[in-house]
Amino acid sequence: MHERHIGPSQEEIDHMLGFLGYKSLDDLMHAALPNGVQSPPDIKIPSHDELTCLTQLAAFAKMNRIKTSMLGQGFYNCITPAVIRRNILENPSWYTSYTPYQPEISQGRLEMLINFQTMICDLTGLEIANASMLDEASCAAEAMLLAKRVSRSSSNKYLVHNGVFPHIRRVLETRADAVGVEIVDLPEGQSIDFDHFGVYAQYQSASGKLLDLRPLFSRSKRAGAICVIGCDLLMLTLFTSPGELGADIAFGSAQRFGIPMNFGGPLASFLAARKAMERSLPGRLVGVSVDADSNHAYRLTLQTREQHIRREKATSNICTATVLMAIAAVAFAQHHGPKGLRAIAHRINTVAVGFARLLKQTAFRVSSLDIFDTIEINNPTQVCVEAESKYDLLFWKVDDNKLRITFDEVTARLDGDLPERLSKVFGISPDKIRDLGCNYDSCDCSFYGDLQQAREGLSSVASRNISVHSDLARHPLRRFSGYLKHPVFNNYTGEVALMRYLKALSDKDFALDRGMIPLGSCTMKLNAAFQLEPVLWPEFANLHPFAPLGDADGTLQIIDQIETWLANLSGYDAVSLQPTAGSQGELAGLLAIRGYYKSLNLDRDVCLIPASAHGTNAASAVLAGMRVVVVACDQQGNIDLDDLRLKASKNAHALAALMVTYPSTHGVYEDNISEVCSVVHKYGGQVYVDGANSNALIGYLRTGDFGGDVSHLNLHKTFGIPHGGGGPGIGPVVAKAHLAPFLPFRNRVHKPSTDLPAVKHMGGPIASSDYGFAGALYISWAYIFCLGSQGMKRCTAVAVLVANYIAKQLSDTFPVLYTGKNNLVAHEFIMDFREVTRVSGITVDDVCKRLIDYGFHAPTMSFPVPGTLMVEPTESEPFSEIQRFIKTIRSIRAEIDRVIDKTYDPDNNPLKRAPHTLEQIASDKWDRPYSRRTGIVYTSGKYWPASARIDNAYGDRNIFCTCPDLPD
């Protein structure tokens, strides 16, 4: 199976090996890997072909039992329009792109992300929103930390209303404890007579009751506190926006905008805030700037907030978003338009309120009719058990005396035999239940969202005396303010228009379907189409994360296998799949270390971090309640052992951990890694190995064997999950046995029939569901199942081979900054441009923009060393593309030499004016001292960037993060 995944043929592999002076891949790896490090045991995972893989996945899918979920709790049935499924979720132009650090070749997804931000701002009534977060519970934690940063209060108390979802409450407790925040319960109606920095309430409480939060927020604001709302986007199409209620921050999940539940995700959450908080906002933020031709263009703005720049002082450790899901969610809004969204919400509300009224006519006691979609019943007796066992209905059981029923886009349709099944459970006539949908069809809900139309609509509804709807029409929290008025939300409700719009946007972007993306530390390898197919199969996609475990037998077997495989491949004893990104895996691992020391009554909080480490490491350490102490690197880019010993001994009483990336962020296998781990262990600390570079390890080296106590792995790098334009990802944490009990909590013990010990994970949860973004795990399962252990080992060796081949080919063009044993690199290497910049004035930014003209995505720029490019080609690239990249870098060097010898003007040359757009080439005006053909580097099938070079400084000086007005 590896023949399809690995780009170069055997003959081409032999050619590259010969060029480097090695006879086999194993010879090369033996020469590159450090001496004295234990080889992994022979892990036997057989390889399989595509058909066998899909057949096995189909068998797992049949083991799942999809019942009618009315569980709610932030996860809802929804309909994914085929136009979105086909044109976004199954389209490599969208799912194989990377985070848009190079904005000129990312204008399509940047436009969709600013559409997403605009949608969130409109619906929440707040001025600024980011480009999506991870799961809803971790987003709630980020909202809490944002409130703490911007509050005028010195208090450490955060008030949490008792109506929030319990899984969100548990994650808040985990995150608050680590940073010294005290969570204080706030029962409904309780007065506040003490200082607090923030208050958080759920707009529609977990019980379903709609809360008028204005009095609560008014009291808190007088005390200098920040007011936070958890809200539902669909509900906000009918009810007053959080901003109008007085909220300073609003967050929630966009899952019900067309994103399947998939046993917990992937999905996109959102976070919006007052404009004054824009520089404290976590996560990615897309803004409007201008390009060199004075055209509007989009870019990531205010990046100085983020961890890759501010490290331990960053606003968050989140270094990505859930871009693909955010794009699908906003496309859902464009597909339906504001009227269509209102209609969906109105039907849900109509059916929910109507059903609650029918229940009140029975022996059941309903808590409130003041609801959007959820009904709480106070005396259900055995309803839950009977509904599930006899009628395949899932209700949320609060306790023995209370249950909740939630209607959504699917169940509110009352299709099929759902009315009959509900009738048998509750003793209500099925005709009366079915009539709720008919009543909806007779009601005009078009007036919501416009003040004047709303006022006129009230009398219209009243005159028709439609009692089912009069509560909504007269509700004190009804929404009068408009939203989604921009043409981008009103011009694409027809499928042809939306299809063409999405196609036009994808054509603006550079993804793996266009060419190589040699981003260092990113591993932009093949995301095989067949591996992605099962993600949207209904047996997987429609599984609620809080469904009974017996309903998820197939998915849980897949999870068991992945956990066992990952543990064996990395050398650890336990795995948690809960982290929804690599950053969250880091946090989970560090919290496990923290929990371990707390269990021993030891106060250890110092985290040693090499100066070369990614900024996420430092930001994660701070969020885990640790103090960062930086360890120097030597001239070869390795950890300075003398400085490590000094820092470890100096902090011996408080040393908790060392975070180290392996291979290093400098692209080499550090020879002294075992000694590094021994030093930390000697002084009582734990070793956290960042697994971001595991594509250089699998099959040859296990971080758990050379001294690692805990690591995270990036399934979106090493194990085939696509990057999705900046997310979603999965960052499972793997740990030794002594840390296993402190991994994120889950309700289920790993089955002892597998190779892993049965250990209960009792650490605090860090995500909304036990298995995080479980819906993407099928991709990694298929990747491992098809390649097998030997195929993955070959992938590692070919990735290292290609990196060394390119590095040696280009060593006389630009120097390779760091090498390891035998002058070899790992799976990536750093090209040093600093001397060239000094003599020519050509910067790495100029080179990156010029690479666009040649049809390449730029390598990673100025990380980990300013003035350099880090190149990671991966094992999947065809040899022809590798050769084209080498030729391109040499051509760019020749262009730089023409600047040095003054053949080219130092400020008006193909590099300084890159990238070159089709608009520029087609223009009658050409004010450049080189030809158009020289500028564009024309080839067959050429990719044209959508914008000229974008002005970064302008974008940061003029913050504008919603859809700009369309030109006349």
Curated annotation (Swiss-Prot):
Family matches, as InterPro entries: Aminotrans_V_dom, GcvP, GDC-P_C, GDC-P_N, GDC_P, PyrdxlP-dep_Trfase, PyrdxlP-dep_Trfase_major, PyrdxlP-dep_Trfase_small
GO BP term (any one): glycine decarboxylation via glycine cleavage system
Catalytic activity, reaction form: N(6)-[(R)-lipoyl]-L-lysyl-[glycine-cleavage complex H protein] + glycine + H(+) = N(6)-[(R)-S(8)-aminomethyldihydrolipoyl]-L-lysyl-[glycine-cleavage complex H protein] + CO2
Residues where N6-(pyridoxal phosphate)lysine is found: K717
GO CC, one annotated term: glycine cleavage complex
Keyword Coiled coil: no
Disulfide bonds: none
EC assignment: 1.4.4.2
Top-level taxon of origin: Bacteria
One Pfam family of this chain: GcvP2_C
Leading EC class: oxidoreductase
Cofactor: pyridoxal 5'-phosphate
Keywords: Oxidoreductase, Pyridoxal phosphate
GO MF: glycine binding; glycine dehydrogenase (decarboxylating) activity; pyridoxal phosphate binding
Function of the protein: The glycine cleavage system catalyzes the degradation of glycine. The P protein binds the alpha-amino group of glycine through its pyridoxal phosphate cofactor; CO(2) is released and the remaining methylamine moiety is then transferred to the lipoamide cofactor of the H protein.
Stored NCBIfam families: gcvP
Quaternary structure (record): The glycine cleavage system is composed of four proteins: P, T, L and H.
Similarity annotation: Belongs to the GcvP family.
Protein name: Glycine dehydrogenase (decarboxylating)
Organism, scientific name: Tropheryma whipplei (strain TW08/27)
